[in-house]
Amino acid sequence: GIRSMAPIYGRRGAVTDDTQMMLFTAEGLLRAFVRQCETGSCHVPAVVHHALQRWLLTQGVEPVLSPCRDGWLIEQPELWSRRAPGNTCLSALMESRVFGEPAVNDSKGCGGVMRVAPCAFFPNPFEVASETARLTHGHPTGYLAAGLFADILNRLWRQSLPLAEVVVIALQAHGGKPGMQETRRLVEYVLRLHQQGVRPNPERIADLGGGWVADEALAIGLWCALAAESLEAHRLFLSAGWRSWSCVM
């Protein structure tokens, strides 16, 4: 199995578009937090939207909107590199007309959930992650799965509880929200598999759909994390031949 950085994009350890967007999301959140502290008022999705529009510039695309260009990440030449960004993220950001407005599409792809991990370390993680993912993904599954992911990470960070227990608590808090049905169903399913001792492998993961949409990516990532008793075991899962578009795990 893989034990070190693998060659990609002509070098070892090059970051993907997923990582690029996660970094720009974190930059937007930090700027929003500072603005909130300084002024007492801030529309977080709008500030994150500025950051994602700066990422769009690094991909060689001039957005319709005019984002603030004084960010730190945009000054890093290594990030001015086109990877393989998803069409939904590109088109939603290219077509945006108002900062902070949700995307006008019905996509539930994993391009929202894969970038919201930084939301776990800021106030109101579920709401902030959902609103951030909704900037590019308009289907409730696309953005509510992102909210649940950030909420789970936040609870793991704040509470010394097993992952399975944290997932149950997060579902109790948010699983009944309108539009959460697909995500709740799939996450509850992998919880049952874990409780029954069923471990993930490439074939079983493929049966879940492969992780190309948000609820699948989250459920697969949680299943692998639940099954891995150690970092080494998790590494084996990641190198078992499974490939998806998402970096949720």
Q: Across the structure, where does each feature detected by a protein language model lie?
A:
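Structured, active/binding-site neighborhoods that engage oxygen-rich ligands
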Residues: 1-249
